[in-house]
Amino acid sequence: MNQGGTADITVLESLTFKTVFFIIRGNYMYYPSLEMLEEMDLSQYDLVPIKKEIYSDMITPIELMRKLKQYSKHVYMLESHEDKNKWGRYTFIGFDPKSEITCYNKMMKVDDKIFKVTHPKEYIRKVLNEHRSLKLEGFPTFTGGLVGYFSFDYFKYSEPSIIKNQKDNGFNDVDLMLFDKVICFDHFKQKLILIVNIGTNDLQKNYKKGIKELDELDYIIRKHVKTLVQPLKLLEDFKPVLSKEEYCQMVEKGIDYIKEGDIFQVVLSNRLYAKATGSLFDSYRVLRTTNPSPYMFYFASDNIEVAGASPETLIKLEETKLTTFPIAGTRKRGKDDQEDQQLIDDLLKDEKEVAEHNMLVDLGRNDLGRISKFNSVHVVSYMDILKFSKVIHIASVVSSEIKEEYDALDAVDALLPAGTLSGAPKIRACQIINQLEQNKRGIYGGAIGYLDFTGNMDLCIGIRLAYKRNNEISICSGAGIVYDSVPENEYQECLNKAGAVVEAIKMADGGIDYDSTH
């Protein structure tokens, strides 16, 4: 290593079957080395990731996101909380995407180009097929891909019978950003993993360029930047689109459809809204700590800002394994552990709630079955209890093996929207939702997360979130309506589910210096 700290190639370890090469510059490690990549068969891939690791003990994800928002309007942050006292291993952050892909009523917009499509998945699949990446050991679960959302109304592309009777609020059916660079906090190792994807067509040239891009990311992270995120200011209190009376009337109509035999269950939602200025980022900062959840997300693009903490996986694809996590059955949290247990016992004995849960587990099995190998669909866990800051839920896990002819986008078609956000039978329930609800749902009840360059996918259901468009914040929530539902109780359930998000926004609006150690 020379005194200037320029790159040397060093063999660190000789193994029985292979030699592992690293590039070391100064105190930092780049992996894999160019020599290692040249020994691989990359003929099936367009991209390969390379990484640089630095210590992360001097910066937090929140601080870094504040900094990156000064560089780009297009950002995302994905995190998880695995149980009561344990954060997920990784936080993924991105900014300044390579491309932005949206679709609205069959009109696809890719950066500055606009064209018509029959189904947006065909173009999205083309993009992913042009960015096929090798999955390497020693890298985190996400190394680059598409990040964003599929709306609830995306369902219309795979089910033409879904006719829109609601007001069109201009929500994109798809809003995805293409990131070939990823910043990953590894909370276990207390390191930042900087990742760029380089082309496999000219390895020497692209590797040199990739090292430069990693160093540029490192510089941005270390550079002192005055972080000015405009604080959130509510201009009015939240009010519902549907009053209690109007929502209860809608529930009664839903019950009529059930009594007539059209459906067994339908999920009917309401939306709270308020005028506001500033950013939702501080609301996310509060929400991630007051309501930690398996899926926590913040992202912003040209026309929307979203902050949420969802408890529920829509669909996860890891190599060939598909998993979905139906959640149905709800109680408000108690004042203490004893009251919590009483509420849990009551929930598990409630025939209405258990019947609703069983119905939606069956629907999840059926949805997976459409794209899965014969006899591979299994209920992995059944009727577990999940506790969150404001509510208690019943949850199950269903998994299967995807058929060889299908991919992640076919899985989105099969699973979206989730039965827990629509009802059963799904198609008829969605038709009834479109008749009874006043507005398109947009991101609420849709799918949020990533589709990566290796073919994997992790999407949660768009619930327990707030979004901001045109200086208006919206929070949507719904309740599952069955034969013996009590309309007033379902209205209250919607308020309970929205409670954690409303509270986080009001805390951020109050200017509370809510300290976060992560």
Question: Which residues are covered by each model-predicted region?
Answer:
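Extended alpha-helical targeting/anchoring segments
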Residues: 20, 25-518
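Intrinsically disordered, low-complexity segments enriched in serine/proline and basic residues
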Residues: 4-6, 11-12, 19-20
